[in-house]
Swiss-Prot record:
Species lineage: Eukaryota, Viridiplantae, Streptophyta, Embryophyta, Tracheophyta
Entry keywords, A to Z: Disulfide bond, Electron transport, Redox-active center, Transport
UniProt GO cellular component terms: cytosol; plastid
Species whose genome carries this gene: Arabidopsis thaliana (Mouse-ear cress)
Single Gene Ontology MF annotation: protein-disulfide reductase [NAD(P)H] activity
Protein name, as recorded: Thioredoxin-like protein Clot
């Protein structure tokens, strides 16, 4: 049906999450956060090969879902920024990221499902995240 994408970074993710929480229409939608590596300015592609592989699969799977899906694309930064052990999303108890891409189903204020970097490119694993949450 419809995939609505919103971009965020470490300094804007909280405001994007607050918008989701306060938006009455978003509460009834399926919401995801896709944590990604930034694009390399010299190539125009992500510096992360797993992100390059997973992004089109994730977008296609979510776009084909019959209900509206909202996706926050959360860009973690360039390679040195992401590799920092103190990266905000590595130490945030809600996310505890260890790799990118990471796809999470976000309901309310918490993660209701996730696919790590080695799983995020597999449609048969993405589809269960679209199931109604309980």
């Amino acid at each position: 049906m419809t995939l609505k994408k919103v971009d965020a970074n470490p300094s804007t993710l909280e405001s994007s999450l607050q918008e989701l929480k306060s938006d009455e229409t978003s509460r009834s939608k399926i919401n995801f956060i896709l944590f990604l590596a930034d694009n390399d300015p010299t190539t125009g592609q992500s510096w992360c090969p797993d992100c390059v592989r997973a992004e089109p699969v994730i977008y296609k799977t979510l776009e084909e879902f019959p209900e509206e899906v909202k996706l926050i694309r959360a860009y973690a930064g360039d390679r040195p920024t992401w590799r920092t052990p103190a990266h905000p999303w590595r130490v945030d108890s809600r996310f505890k990221l260890t790799g990118v891409p990471t796809l999470v189903r976000w309901d309310g204020d918490s993660v209701k499902g996730r696919l790590e970097d080695h799983q995020a490119h597999l449609p048969h694993l993405i589809l269960p995240l679209l199931a109604p949450s309980t």
